[in-house]
Every structure is written in C-alpha cells, then in structure tokens.
Amino acid sequence: MVLSIRSQIIIGVVSSILLTSTILAIAYILMWFNGHMTLTLTLTTIITSCLTLLICSIFINPLIQKIKQFNIKTKQFANGNYASNDKTFNSPKEIYELNQSFNKMASEITQQMNQIKSEQQEKTELIQNLAHDLKTPLASIISYSEGLRDGIITKDHEIKESYDILIKQANRLSTLFDDMTHIITLNTGKTYPPELIQLDQLLVSILQPYEQRIKHENRTLEVNFCSEIDAFYQYRTPLERILTNLLDNALKFSNVGSRIDINISENKDQDTIDIAISDEGIGIIPELQERIFERTFRVENSRNTKTGGSGLGLYIANELAQQNNAKISVSSDIDVGTTMTVTLHKLDITT
C-alpha cells in the first residue's frame, strides 16, 4: 500500500500522541506522577501535537500541490508530449533541484528525439530518391533490350549505340547499388584494420579501372609526387573508396577532353599526406562549397541523367574521411575547376 505524504504525517503525529500517552500512563501506574499532573501532560501533548499537525499542513499543502504538478508533467513527458514546459518550482530546494534535473534530462531527450526524427526523415527521403534513380536506368535497359530482342533495332550503328547505352546504364546501376551499400554500412560502426600502404601502388590499383574511360573521353590524367613518400599505415579500404568517389566526381562534372591532375605532397612536421584531385569542370559557387558534403544537398541537386549515380559520392567520401582519421577540403572557381584535397594522418602503429 502506497501512502501519501499527508497520510504519513498524520500517522506520524497520531503515533507520537499514542506513544506519549502510553509513557504517561506507565508513569502514572508507577506513581511517578499524580493523576492531575498526568492529565495535564496528556492534554498538553495532544494540543501540541494537533498544533504541530496544523502547522505542518499549512506548509505541506503547497509542497503536495507542487509534487502533483510535477507528477502531471512527468506523465505528459512519458506519454510522448515533449513540448517545452517552462513551469519552475523555486522552493523547497529539493523540489527545485529535482525539477532542474528533470528539465535538463527532458531537454536532452527532446533533442535526441528530434535528431532521430530528422535522421529518419532523411533516410526515408534518401530511399525514395534512390528508388526513383533506379527506375531510370532500369527502364532504359528494358527498353533497349526489348528493341534488340524484337528486331526493332537493326542497323549496325544503332545496335552498337544500344549496347553502349546498356553498358552505361548497367554501370550506373552498379554505382547506385554501391552507394546504397555504403550508406547502409556508414553508421554501423564497422572498423577496418590499418594496413601498410605504398601510395604509388595504391593509386595504380585505383586508376587502372579508369584507363579505358580516360582514353575513350580523350582526357589527360597526370599524377605528380612532390617528393618521395615512404610507405605508411592507413585504413586502405576507406581510403580507396574516398579517392574513387572524388575521382568519379571530377570526371562527372568536367567536360570530355579536359584534364585531371592528382598532386601528392607530404608534410613531415605534421606527419600528414595531401592528395589533391583537380579538374577543369564547371566549378562550385562559394556559398555551396560548405554544403556539397551534405547528404540531402547532394541528393536534391545531383540527381540527373547526365551525370548518373545518386549524388551521394561526396557525402560518402566525407563520412568515411571523418571516421578514419582524414579530412577533405574543397577549393573551386566557376568555369575554371575544382580541387578536392584529402589530408591523411599517418597512423602510429606501435608493436
């Protein structure tokens, strides 16, 4: 049975009266006090206890009301009403401190809930946009496949063009699936073991798949080492993905026949390596340069059939960089080009 504060006080006062009366009765039986004195002491005890109860009630009633209000407040919060409640309790001290602690907890939980809702909304929009992006290449693949199957496309140059489109759309689908996979695994806390990296060999493995595309688009790609860089420890898998995404971005947003430069430099004082990928593309206006790594920004502004993909490459690259002891910075001029620089911190591997 759970008793209220008022009930507990009343029980305490009544118990005090009964205990005092019992002691006085025993004292009377033992003839420590005469009858008149015992009666006087008993009445005095009862009157004093009643006055004490009255005074306690005067002070305790406001406290009880505050506790009831605080209880209502906590129930509303427990039921999902996270609206701000500015009601404060200035006294007594314990109630004030309890209210302050609750308000702090409520504020933190509200922020977390809002963040969760925002992230959930972003994920929903992201999935919807990716689903929309998947429809376009699939529709194109189905259309050209049916045309080839049914004999609608018969001329040699049309057949070759159709195969080129099918390959292009299949590659686009592959990129979309890669982006979806990386988005799913970004926040899973997956870790990668540090590996000894020889940078020239790493770049060869990254650039090799682009060889045919660079030749086909009549581009020039140059890799420049400012100095000889010794092997160092870093997270190879995320680094490969970061550089691949930045290179993809440079190729997407620059014209056929343009130049791509990769410049590598080392800062031995800070124990860092800079890998700068520069293009001669359309550039990025200054007010958008800080937003290009946002997930929603890229989804909203890069979804088009010309560039392909989901527009999430820079977001994925930046997230991987932050998670793996690296940083990406951007420098760009409109109609001149963009330079994306990855700054790697060499890992200190102690045995």
Curated annotation (Swiss-Prot):
The modification Phosphohistidine is found at residue 132. One of its GO terms (cellular component) is plasma membrane. Autophosphorylated. Its main location: membrane. Its EC number is 2.7.13.3. Residues 129-348 form the Histidine kinase domain. GO terms for molecular function: ATP binding; phosphoprotein phosphatase activity; phosphorelay sensor kinase activity. It is a multi-pass membrane protein. Pfam families: HAMP, HATPase_c, HisKA. It is found in: Cell membrane. The chain crosses the membrane at residues 9-29, 40-60. Keywords: ATP-binding, Cell membrane, Kinase, Membrane, Nucleotide-binding, Phosphoprotein, Transferase, Transmembrane, Transmembrane helix, Two-component regulatory system, Virulence. SMART domains: HATPase_c (SM00387), HisKA (SM00388). PROSITE patterns: HAMP, HIS_KIN. InterPro entries: 2-comp_sensor_kinase (IPR050351), HAMP_dom (IPR003660), HATPase_C_sf (IPR036890), His_kinase_dom (IPR005467), HisK_dim/P_dom (IPR003661), HisK_dim/P_sf (IPR036097), Sig_transdc_His_kin-like_C (IPR004358). It comes from the Bacteria. Residues 61-114 form the HAMP domain. One of its GO terms (biological process) is cellular response to phosphate starvation. It catalyses: ATP + protein L-histidine = ADP + protein N-phospho-L-histidine. Member of the two-component regulatory system SaeR/SaeS involved in the regulation of staphylococcal virulence factors in a strain-dependent fashion. Probably functions as a membrane-associated protein kinase that upon sensing the appropriate signal, autophosphorylates and in turn activates the cytosolic response regulator SaeR. This is Histidine protein kinase SaeS. It comes from Staphylococcus aureus (strain MRSA252). The lineage of its organism: Bacteria, Bacillati, Bacillota, Bacilli, Bacillales.
